[in-house]
Swiss-Prot record:
Organism this protein belongs to: Pseudomonas sp. (strain CF600)
Protein keywords: Aromatic hydrocarbons catabolism, Lyase, Plasmid
Protein name from the UniProt record: 4-oxalocrotonate decarboxylase
Gene3D superfamilies: Fumarylacetoacetase-like, C-terminal domain
NCBIfam families: catechol_dmpH
Amino acid sequence: MNRTLTRDQVLALAEHIENAELDVHDIPKVTNDYPDMTFADAYDVQWEIRRRKEARGNKVVGLKMGLTSWAKMAQMGVETPIYGFLVDYFSVPDGGVVDTSKLIHPKIEAEISFVTKAPLHGPGCHIGQVLAATDFVIPTVEVIDSRYENFKFDLISVVADNASSTRFITGGQMANVADLDLRTLGVVMEKNGEVVELGAGAAVLGHPASSVAMLANLLAERGEHIPAGSFIMTGGITAAVPVAPGDNITVRYQGLCSVSARFI
């Protein structure tokens, strides 16, 4: 993989971006200072942020996919989605409270998450292998929060920023993947009692399981895989909706439960 950053530059950028998250302040996108950064560089920075969190005692509890719309990929001129990691303090219970004082400019997306019962290895992982390896799926609302000024960034910068990961809210109802048609599963997002977004599972690469397969193949490029028991958020079914203190959100999943949270 093509790289342009030295190890010291990777370490410095990881500290810079993570400090923006922890200290709750925005920063210019990193490609302003490093215009020749590559995807390999960006993932090196992301994995170093992960290492920093684990060294601090945080536990990695899942993975997430981003840029999982074919239209969005075409718009950005890329052929694959991106991924990030989730740590323990990102998790919020259904009906719980999200403290916006710890976030910069949060937005929410409706997603379907997979939990695996068998490992998945790339390259060449496909949707059939994912479905066979799935223990259950669970409705999830992701809170994204770019550390970059005005939520404006390029693809390299957002990969380095752990794909804008910050919080996630899981519903209480698990479902067998064989009992659902995830392509046509409908989603209604409400904010303060008003419908703000509608979507269906096919918005995620035609089928959310395709997102998991792509994750396995992306991880294989770094010699990694998806272990059994992994929690994976597959990407936004809806567009991202800004939230602010005082907002109450509910996302209703067809044939499943709803997921709610309050922002303070």
